[in-house]
A protein has these predicted regions:
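Accessory "access/gating" subregions that flank catalytic or transport cores
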Residues: 75-141
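Generic alpha-helical secondary structure signal
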Residues: 71, 94-98, 204, 250
């Protein structure tokens, strides 16, 4: 249902309707139906939750009709790596089988139902994300912290998530990353916050900025040690060379202003 005007999320609904299952031969027709209600708009996996409810309801009816245990049916028909989604893309590793198997093996699922009004259900769902474009820069500070500048408006904790991704890349704690969401003039082009893309796309930008910092830190350490950069490596938050040469991230950060100036990754 689109409400009083066209524009319901019918396209992602069609993309998601069979996406939890291996369906080798399928055709999906979607209709944007106007009704006498307020206009719809996108909110958290638009289109997917509605079609997943419909699909999983039908799957439960099939299981009941054929006397098949619900997790068994889902495991036997699960989408997995190499399966082509109904709208074309081929899956990498998606974890559908592993998730259902973990549910099936859980103490909760194995506990017998004893009450007259007790029941237990299982449902699966699918959502994708878009990539688009993101930019991020990260600057090493002399106190060992890192300033992360990015352009994705934070509506659900992305500052924390991106800080954790950069911190993991550099082998430091998330608390040592200081994230900031800045305006259009202060960072490279960054697409919309939406489409489940920020942690993925802006996260990749943050990780690449971290990788750039790693390379520059290794080059700076090689200069200090007067050795070939090829023998210096970055490992677990440390810069390690030959002959027992070693800096922690914080130790080398304290030396950057006296050995060539700030280090910024992008």
């Amino acid at each position: 249902e689109a409400g009083g005007y066209t524009g319901s999320p019918i396209a992602p609904g069609c993309m998601c309707v069979f996406s939890c299952y291996e369906v080798p031969h399928a055709r999906v027709d979607g209709f944007d139906v106007c009704v006498n209600k307020p206009r719809t708009n996108a909110y958290r996996a638009p289109g997917s939750t509605q079609v997943c409810f419909a699909t999983e309801t039908i799957v439960d009816e099939i299981c009941k009709e054929l006397d098949i245990e619900p997790t068994e049916f889902r495991l036997n028909n699960a989408a997995k790596e190499g399966v082509r989604r109904v709208d074309g893309p081929v899956y990498g590793k998606v974890g559908m089988e592993e998730t259902v198997q973990a549910i099936r093996d859980s103490d909760h699922y194995q506990t017998p139902l004893t009450g007259k009004f007790q029941g237990r259900g299982i449902a699966t769902g699918f959502w994708f994300n878009c990539g688009l474009k993101s930019a991020a820069t990260a600057t090493v500070n002399p106190d060992g912290t890192v300033s992360l500048v990015e352009g994705s408006t934070d509506i659900g904790g992305s500052r924390t998530g991106l800080a954790m991704q950069l911190a993991e890349t550099l082998g430091i704690t998330a608390e040592e990353v200081k994230p900031a969401v800045v305006d259009t003039d202060s960072v490279g082009y960054t697409d919309v916050t939406g489409g489940s893309r920020v942690t993925f796309a802006t996260g990749i930008a943050a990780i690449k900025a971290g990788n750039d910092i790693q390379q520059q830190m290794c080059a700076r350490a090689a200069m200090i040690w007067d050795c070939d950069e090829a023998v210096v490596r970055y490992e677990d938050g440390c810069i390690i060379g030959s002959e027992n040469n070693r800096f922690t991230f914080k130790e080398l950060a304290a030396k950057i202003n006296a050995t060539g100036g700030p280090i910024a990754g992008r």
